[in-house]
Amino acid sequence: MSLSHGTGAPAISTPLTLRPPPDNTKAILTIAIGIAASLVFFMLTRNNLPHVGDNIHSLPHGGSYIDGTKSINYRPPASRYPSSNLLAFAPPILAAVLFFLTQPYLATRRSRCVRCFVVHGACTNHT
């Protein structure tokens, strides 16, 4: 018999309730997807073009400048720079994302029984 803090009353022991920790996987996955998408978008849209011009005149997208003492003629950037081809990659990326997002839905539709609409193996109980 144990005493509680010298009062003479027996200590009441309560059972510990065990609860699983909160499941934060959806929140972490959402944050990770957002960070990854923003990094990809940032890397595809940043300016990787070489510096053209001097400290006063900058022509990163092509053009010409003529004044009394100097002239500069620069062509626009070629298509080999990824920042100028951002929209060319959009349809394949969008198609891949839509494909992977619809796969769980299509997989559950294919495995459902056409008689009882339950997901299980071969439907042998409806003969």
UniProtKB/Swiss-Prot annotation:
UniProt name for this protein: Movement protein TGB2
Location of this chain's protein in the cell: Host endoplasmic reticulum membrane
Keywords: Host endoplasmic reticulum, Host membrane, Membrane, Transmembrane, Transmembrane helix, Transport, Viral movement protein
Family to which this protein belongs: Belongs to the Tymovirales TGBp2 protein family.
UniProt source species: Foxtail mosaic virus
Cytoplasmic side: 1-24, 107-127
Protein's GO biological process: transport of virus in host, cell to cell
Role: Plays a role in viral cell-to-cell propagation, by facilitating genome transport to neighboring plant cells through plasmosdesmata,.
GO CC, any one term: host cell endoplasmic reticulum membrane
Lumenal compartment spans: 46-85
Transmembrane stretches, start-end: 25-45, 86-106
The UniProt record lists the keyword Lyase: no
More about this protein: TGBp1, TGBp2 and TGBp3 seem to act together for cell-to-cell propagation. TGBp1 is the main movement protein that physically cross the plasmodesma with the viral genome. TGBp2 and TGBp3 would facilitate TGBp1 function.
InterPro entries (UniProt xref): Plant_vir_prot (IPR001896)
